[in-house]
A protein has these predicted regions:
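Glycine-rich phosphate-binding loop and adjoining helix at the ATP-binding site
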Residues: 107-205
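Gly/Thr-rich phosphate-binding beta-strand-loop-beta motif of the actin/hexokinase/Hsp70
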Residues: 69-106, 207-210
Length: 210
């Protein structure tokens, strides 16, 4: 039997619903339908599919002022995890978070920066040891965010300049080839701002100082 093709619109709708559930913590299908201005059958079908994918779960029932109680929905926060590596002049920070943005583990290790294959290989090994402490299967890791104090050029895929690390034109490929997971590279200030935006998703505008 041929599998049903999913359109971009359907993917975007499912993403909207998932993000709303994550932002809300506990929510019902009628709440989602009302807030996102979608029909209840559409929302119910999408949340059913998200449950089948393991991304959200039923979490009891919500209180009702009358009539049938609505099922409470919440994200399955530990279904997938994300790792982070914060590179500074003298240290590396390692972090593990779940889909709710909750920090599951954090370590800061003294390890002075050096632009060399040995350095990036060792950082990758330290990350693997860090993850093994939590007994995390590799397939549960969505990817690794790597923050560096420098100017990033996403089109050239390189760190164009870092006064702190005293480097220029450091390509992403020069670093990511040592990691077993998909990598995304960010300027350290942007990484911090993104983390705040993720946690404070209800805020439409905010100002970040680092």
């Amino acid at each position: 039997m041929a599998s049903k093709k999913i359109t971009n619109m359907e993917v975007k709708r499912k993403n909207r619903i998932y993000r709303y559930v994550r932002k809300s913590g506990i929510v019902s299908n009628p709440d989602i339908a009302y807030e996102l201005k979608l029909s209840l059958p559409t929302v119910t079908q999408n949340t059913k599919e998200l449950i089948e994918l393991g991304l959200i779960k039923e979490n009891g029932e919500l209180e009702s002022t009358g009539g049938r109680k609505a099922k409470a929905l919440a994200i399955e926060a530990d279904f997938r995890l994300a790792a982070g590596v914060d590179i500074t002049k003298n240290h590396i920070g390692l972090i593990l978070t779940n889909l709710a943005g909750e920090i599951l583990r954090y370590e800061r290790i003294y390890y002075p920066f050096c632009r060399s294959e040995e350095y990036f290989s060792e950082v990758s090994q330290k990350l693997e040891k860090f993850l093994k402490k939590e007994k995390i299967a590799a397939e549960r890791i969505l990817g690794v965010g790597i923050s560096i104090p420098g100017i990033t050029d996403m089109e050239k895929r390189e760190i164009t300049n870092s006064h702190v690390l005293n480097i220029k034109a450091l390509s992403f490929q020069e670093m990511e080839k040592f990691f077993a997971y998909p990598c995304i590279f960010l300027n350290d200030a942007n990484a911090g701002a993104n983390a705040e935006a993720f946690q404070g998703e209800k805020e439409k505008k905010f100002f970040y100082l680092s």
